[in-house]
Amino acid sequence: MSVSATENDVPRFFVGCEESDELLDQSKPENLDNLYEHTEDEEDEEDDEYDSPPERQIVVGICAMAKKSKSKPMKEILERLSLFKYITVVIFEEEVILNETVENWPLCDCLISFHSKGFLLDKAVAYAKLRNPFVINDLNLQYQIQDRREVYRILTNEGIMLPRYAVLNRDPNKPEECNLIEGEDHVEVNGEIFQKPFVEKPVSAEDHNVYIYYPTSAGGGSQRLFRKIGSRSSVYSPESSVRKTGSYIYEEFMPTDGTDVKVYTVGPDYAHAEARKSPALDGKVERDSEGKEVRYPVILNAREKLIAWKVCLAFKQTVCGFDLLRASGQSYVCDVNGFSFVKNSMKYYDDCAKILGNIIMRELAPVFHIPWSIPLEAEDIPIVPTTSGTKMELRCVIAVIRHGDRTPKQKMKMEVRHQRFFDLFEKYHGYKTGKIKLKKPKQLQEVLDIARQLLVELGQNNDSEIEESKAKLEQLKTVLEMYGHFSGINRKVQLTYLPHGCPKTSSEEEDCRREEPSLLLVLKWGGELTPAGRVQAEELGRAFRCMYPGGQGDYAGFPGCGLLRLHSTYRHDLKIYASDEGRVQMTAAAFAKGLLALEGELTPILVQMVKSANMNGLLDSDSDSLSSCQHRVKARLHEILQRDRDFSSEDFEKLSPTGSVSQIKSMHFIKNPVKTCDKVYSLIQSLTSQIRQRMEDPKFADIQLYHSETLELMLRRWSKLEKDFKTKNGRYDISKIPDIYDCIKYDVQHNCSLKLENTMELYRLSKALADIVIPQEYGISRPEKLEIAKGYCTPLVRKIRSDLQRTQDDDTVNKLHPLYSRGVMSPERHVRTRLYFTSESHVHSLLSILRFGALCDETKDEQWKRAMDYLNVVSELNYMTQIVIMLYEDPNKDVSSEERFHVELHFSPGAKGCEEDKNLPSGFGYRPASQENESSKKHTHANDSDEDLGVCRRDEPDRALVMFKPMVSDPIHIHRKSPLPRSRKIGSVEVLSDNNSHLRTARLLEQKHIGLGFELYSMVPSICPLETLHNSLSLKQVDEFLSAVAAPSSDYQMDTPTASPSTPGFYTYVGGRKISLNTYTPTKILPPLFPVSTDVEMSDSVFQSCSSTSMVPGLAGSADNTERNHQAQDD
C-alpha cells in the first residue's frame, strides 16, 4: 500500500459518545446536510473549511458489543484502518447502543455493525435507515444468519454443496414438518433416513450444542459439542437417543480426517483459510507453546475459492467467516458465522485493514470530493519491464533448495545375534526383503527396550557373547535416550540379515569369523535441522518473497508483501515438495512459514503444506546403492589422494579435467595429500585429548553444548572419526573427509564456547580436502558428472520441464472461475510456484546438468561464459544452496513466437562459511530482467548487451544483499506486534520509487542490528545472495535441453530433437484453423477447442477438460509416462 504521511499525522481513532456529535459534524460536506443534525454556525464553519480546502475525514462507525468491538483482533485492524489519511474510526459505546435512542448515536459515514449475544440488531437496522451510511455487512441478512434453516436455504439456492440434511420443525402450527421416527441405528426425519453417525444441530445458530450420534457397532453414545471452555470443546456421552424438545437440523456426518477448515473472507476476492483439529475428534483443544489453539495453514482449491466468493456475496457480508468440511474429495459448507476475524495473524490484520480501507475510500471518496483513486499495487499486476523495454508477466517460479544447517550425521554398526533382535526382525517382516528400517517411535522404543534388557543381563552375569558388544550397546542406549522422546525424524535403526555372519573388513570389528546367521544393526542419528537451520530457512523464505511482483513494496513495513497478497487473492498456485529426510522436511516447513508469513509451530505447517516426494524418487535416492560409475570415480579419487608426494601436473589433469578454479586452488593449498591427512589426523587426536581434559575439568562440568549435546557424545563423535580415518594398515580412509569437515564446521560454528585449540587450522585443512573430495564424488570428468547426475536427477528434471510446460492446473487451482472473476483486478494473472527441498546430492547433480549438459554455448554466449567462470570459483554448495528458474510471458507476442516466453536462471551457494573469505566468489549480482531495464536506463545507450551488465556489476550486489541477506528480523518475536509503522498514515497516491531504495536499505540494516543481540543469531551464518546465471533464455531452448537430459541414455544427445509433437514443426487443427504448437507454447495460451458461452455456467468437469492437454494429443512431446505421473502429483 502506498504511504503518505508526516510525522505529525496521528491515527484518528477514538471511542464515540454523545459529545462527539459536534466534532463529527465538522467533517460533513454541505451537500449531505439533510442526513445530519447541524446548526447554522456549524454550516458556516463548514463552508469556510470547504473553501480552504480542508482534509475531509470519512468517519467509520463500529457498532457492536464491547466484547467484540474492543477485542484484540478488532483493535489491531482498526489501528491499521486509522492509518488511512482520510479515515477516522469511532467506536459506539455499548452503553449508548443499549440505552440511547438511535437519534443520539454518534454519526458516521460508514457503518461496521454485526450481531452477537445481547446485541440489539433492531436498533442497528433503525440507525442505518435513519442515517443511511455505507454499510459494510448487510444488517437485514444478519437475522437470517441467526437461523440455520435460512442459512442452508440460501446456500442451496446458490448451488453450494451441503451435507445431506433434513429439518425437524417442532411447530404446533406445522405438524407435517415434525415427523420423527427413531431406530436403534438411524432416524427418519420427514421421510429422510439418516444412518448413524449423523449430526443433530439446533436451528438457532446461537445454540452451539451440536450432537453427533454413533452407531452401536462403534459403541454407541454421542459426542456433545459446545463453545470452547478452557481446553475442552466436546465431551462423550453414553446417551444414544436424540433430543425430544426443540427444532433441529439432522445431517449426514462427513468424515474429515479430524480437521475442519475455517474460511475468513474480506470482500469476495480475498479469503484466509485455516484448519483446526475437529472438536468432534476427542474434544481436546490443541494448543501451542503460547497457549493458542493450533491452527493449520490451508491453501484453498478452486472450488473452495468459488464457494468463498459466493458466500460473501449471497449473505452480503463483506467480512464473513464460514466452516468447510473436506470429505471424499469434495468441500461442503456446514456453517456460516457472519462477521468473523482471524485471530493472531498480523498478516491478516494488515490485509483486512487495507482491503476495508480501499472499499470505503472507493465508495465514499467521490461523495466527499476527496482526490483519491485506488492505488495500483505492484502485486495486483505481476508484470515487470525487460531489457528490451517490453513488459513481461511472471508465470512460474521453480526452486531447488538444499536443507538448512544440521547436526553432524553419525552412524554406528554392530553385529547382533541375540534372539530378541531376530524376533524384532521377524515381527516387521524382515525375512521378506532381508532388511528393515525402524523409524517410528514405537519401533525405536522396542530397540531401546532390548538394549536396556541386554545391559541389565550383562550386569548380572558375564555372558561373553553379549560382552563383546557392551560398549556399542551402551552407545545404542545413549543415542536412543537422547532428547527424552522419539520424534521419528532424527534417528533410525536398520537391520540387515546376514546368512553367514558379517565379513570382517572394518577396523572396528573382531578378527574372528562365525558362520551362523546374524543381523547387522546400523544405527543412524544426527543430521537433524538445528535451531539455526530453522532460522536460516524461515528468513530465506521471507527474503524469497522479494522475487515476486510487489516484492519491493514497503506496505506493512516488511518486504515481499506482494507475494502474500497474490497468495491470498487466489492467484498463487504453490506446492512444496520435500524428500523424506526429517531435516529436509523441517527446512521446507520453516521456509513456508517465512514465505507465507505463517505463525505457530512447524509441525502443523509440515503436515498441511509440504508434500512428500519419496514415492517416485523425485527427491530421494538410495544412498546404499551407488552406481558403477560412482564406484569407479571413488576408487580413482582414493588412489590419487593416497600418494605420498606433492600433486604433479598429471594429478591436476586427472583430478580437475573440468578446470575448476576452486579445486585447483585447494590442490595448491594441500600440495601433498598424505602429509595433509597426517596433519588432520594429529589435529583430531589433539581435539579428542582436549575434550577429555574438559570432561575432567570442574569448570566445564555444567557446560551446555549446542543442541543439547554432551561432552561425552562430542567425544564419541570425534573418537569414532579418529578411529575410522586412519586404518590398521596406516592408510587413510578418504571417504571420512566429508564427515571430518562436517564435524569441525559444526563445532567451530556452534561450540566455540569450549575454546578448543587449533580448530580453525583443522577447519581449513579439512575444508581444502573436502573441496576436492565432495564435488568429485559426483564425477571427475564431464561425462562422469553427467552420468551420475542423470542417475540422481532424471525424475526431477522431468518434473521441472513439466512445471514449465504444463499449466492446465493453473486454470483450475490458482484462480477463480472466469465467469466469477469479473470483479477481480487482472484475474488471468497468476503465478505458479514449485519448491523442491532436497539434499546435497540432488543439488550437486542438478548443477552438473546445467553446467555440463550444453544448455548454452560458452564460446558464443558471453553471459553464460561469465556464469560458468563464477561457478568454477564456487568451492562448496553449502546449506540453503538455491537453484532458481523463473518463467515470464509476454502476452503481446504471438503464441508461436520464441519471444513470447523468457526464462531466467539464478543461483546461490547458500550459507557463508565459518571463516570470512575475502576471496569469496562474486558474480554479477541478482539481475532479473526488471533490474536490467533500470540499469540500461542509467547508461547513455539502450543496448542490452553483456558489456553493459559488466558496467553495473558493482551496483547489483547491493540490491541483492538487501534482498537475500535475510538477517533482518527477530524470528522468535516476529509476530510480537504489527510490523506496520504506526507513526505513519497510509495514503493513497504516493508510490515508493527506486529513489527511496537507499532509505529502505538503511532501515533494513538498522533492523538487522537490533536482532544481533539474540543468542541464536551468533550461530546463523548469513546466506550468499542470488547470482543471475542467465536472464535471457528462451523457453524453447530450456525445454529442448531438459527434454534431451531426461531422455533415456541411449537417446541422450545434446542436439535438438527431431520433429515431433513437441517441436516447432508440429501442427494441430482447432476449429478448422491450423495452429502451430511449440515446446514453448504451454497449454494455458492454446485457443479453446470449442466456443465457450458466457451465458451458461460451465461445470467444473467441462472446465477442466477444456484446459487439459489430453484434448491436444502429443502436446507433451517425447516426455514419457513418468513426467505425466509427476504432474498428477500436483492435483
Swiss-Prot record:
One of its GO terms (molecular function) is inositol hexakisphosphate 1-kinase activity. Residues 21-53, 912-951 are annotated as: Disordered. The keyword Cytoplasm applies. GO terms for cellular component: cytosol. Residues 25-38, 934-951 have a biased composition (Basic and acidic residues). One of its GO terms (biological process) is inositol metabolic process. InterPro entries: Acid_Pase_AS (IPR033379), His_Pase_clade-2 (IPR000560), His_Pase_VIP1 (IPR037446), His_PPase_superfam (IPR029033), VIP1_N (IPR040557). Belongs to the histidine acid phosphatase family. VIP1 subfamily. This is Inositol hexakisphosphate and diphosphoinositol-pentakisphosphate kinase 2. It comes from Xenopus laevis. The gene is ppip5k2.
